Amino acid sequence: MIIKILIADDHTIVREGLKQILMDTSDMVVAAEAANGQEVLDKIWKDDFDVVVLDIAMPGRSGLDILKELKSFKPRLPVLVLSMYPEDQYALRVLRAGADGYLTKESAPNDLITAIRKVYSGKKYISNFLAEKLAFGLEADAARPPHELLSDREYQVMCSISSGKTVKEIADELSLSVKTISTYRARILEKMGMKNNAELTHYSIQNHLVD
């Protein structure tokens, strides 16, 4: 059985690199590519794939939103998230959102192949580091950093603010009102125990949540 894969990443060089890695396997084929979240949804509506390899940080709609919509439409379609973010910052969030596995872009090529085969077989793929974190219950609220207590939307807005985007830009990007984004901002500051955008940005940089 050949595993049909949809690769979703906004960087052409990354997609080409992934195709080169998978080209050497006898049981996988890259059946389609997508450069943004909407393309991902369009392609899974029109065709059937065995695994989606999804970059969580593409332009446009939030990768978490795309993941949730994809899973609501095809709940049994395995999704392996491939991300530049360290797994201790983002993996638990995407797994809770429905991802079947999480891999950083710094991982070895063999890890990618192993992960695809594992999620295709119906299992979850996580690293040994993350498995230990889950096993010891370090995701419990008391031990989690403040940003992990935010909702997915709050987290998304926080990262956008920390990246220097204005409330208007974030509202346009998420198709929400300026008032709604301002409400999210106030809620984020309260939950994080911070006073302004500068403190949020400093925190996000310290915790490697933004570039």
PLM feature segments, named:
Residues I56-M58:
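Receiver (REC) domain active-site loop signature in two-component systems and cognate sites
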Residues L189-D211:
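Basic, Lys/Arg-enriched C-terminal extension of HTH/homeodomain DNA-binding domains
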Residues D27-A35, K43, M194:
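Short hydrophobic/Thr-rich beta-strand motif most characteristic of the beta2 strand and flanking loop
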Residues Q89-R96, G101-D152, Q156, L209-V210:
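Short, flexible helix-to-coil linker/hinge segments that flank and couple to helix-turn-helix
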Residues R144-K179:
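Helix-turn-helix DNA-binding segment
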Residues N36-E39, S62-D65:
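Acidic catalytic/metal-coordinating carboxylates
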Residues D47-V53:
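Active-site beta3 strand of CheY-like receiver
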